[in-house]
């Protein structure tokens, strides 16, 4: 899978994209990550990529000409079809379901917004999708682009063991169960005995129950989505009822 990141600040990506899982995935040829400095497509000697907004107001707006030229050139650099995504607080909220969808694509072009945003005409003509990583505002789209690359890349076949992904938080609208490792007792706190029992069936049931309990406590809004998606079994629903879950209040209100 290929990621193309269009940004005014490529140096921000030094480090995060060359460590840990992303580093190994690139070395193994599972993913490619290409950085593109939008200023390379400016035409003046000052490499101006932004200007004041028409109508007045604070801040600057990313200019249409260099950004459009960058998107078109990067699209043409590889024959694989790609989806052009603008990272912006105005966008659709990124979820694990969207991440799964994006991971099936051969190529993503991630456009990092900055300043007050980009010229609306570029959004209307060259942007396929807009994504946000949360209901807050960052200085630019660079950190959001890193989040998208990390979240999507780990679902590309061969990047992470598939068994590790199955029970991760949000994989089926449920949060992940607690994890423990050696020593068995730390500062007087012991690992749950079931995890030391060697009984795989009991361990699986404990982990499922902990996922349900943790989701109910921390993200009850997810339970309604899990129920609607049909991922909750009769045993799940019975346990949740014992824990006091009522579907009509699962939106967290």
UniProtKB/Swiss-Prot annotation:
Subcellular location: Cytoplasm
Keywords, ordered alphabetically: Cytoplasm, Methyltransferase, S-adenosyl-L-methionine, Transferase, tRNA processing
GO annotations of cellular component type: cytosol
A GO BP entry: tRNA N1-guanine methylation
A Pfam family this chain is assigned to: tRNA_m1G_MT
Residue positions binding S-adenosyl-L-methionine: 113, 133-138
Gene3D superfamilies: 3.40.1280.10, tRNA(m1g37)methyltransferase, domain 2
Reaction(s) this enzyme catalyzes, per UniProt: guanosine(37) in tRNA + S-adenosyl-L-methionine = N(1)-methylguanosine(37) in tRNA + S-adenosyl-L-homocysteine + H(+)
EC category name: transferase
Functional description taken from the UniProt entry: Specifically methylates guanosine-37 in various tRNAs.
The family this protein is said to belong to: Belongs to the RNA methyltransferase TrmD family.
Assembly description: Homodimer.
Name of the protein this chain belongs to: tRNA (guanine-N(1)-)-methyltransferase
Organism: Chloroflexus aurantiacus (strain ATCC 29366 / DSM 635 / J-10-fl)
Name of the gene this protein is made from: trmD
């Amino acid at each position: 899978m290929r990621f193309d990141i269009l940004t005014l600040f490529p140096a921000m990506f030094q480090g995060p994209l060359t460590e840990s899982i992303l580093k190994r995935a690139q070395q193994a040829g599972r993913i490619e990550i290409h950085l593109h400095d939008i200023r390379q497509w400016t035409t003046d000697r000052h490499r101006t990529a932004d200007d004041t907004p028409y109508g007045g107001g604070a801040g600057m707006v990313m200019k249409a000409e260099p950004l459009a030229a960058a998107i078109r050139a990067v699209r043409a650099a590889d024959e694989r079809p790609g989806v052009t995504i603008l990272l912006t607080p105005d966008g659709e909220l990124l979820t694990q379901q969207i991440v799964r969808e994006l991971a099936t694509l051969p190529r993503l072009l991630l456009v990092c917004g900055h300043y007050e945003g980009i010229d609306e005409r570029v959004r209307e003509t060259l942007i396929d999708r807009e994504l946000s990583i949360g209901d807050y505002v960052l200085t630019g789209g660079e950190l959001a682009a890193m989040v998208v690359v990390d979240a999507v890349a780990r679902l590309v076949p061969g990047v992470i063991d598939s068994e590790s992904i199955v029970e991760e938080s949000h994989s089926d609208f449920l949060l992940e169960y607690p994890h423990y490792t050696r020593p068995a007792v730390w500062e007087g706190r012991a690992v749950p005995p079931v995890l030391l029992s060697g009984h795989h069936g009991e361990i699986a049931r404990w982990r499922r129950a902990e996922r349900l309990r943790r989701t109910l406590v921390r993200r009850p809004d997810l339970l309604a989505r899990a129920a609607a998606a049909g991922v909750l079994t009769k045993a799940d629903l019975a346990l949740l009822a014992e824990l006091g879950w009522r579907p009509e209040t699962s939106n967290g209100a």
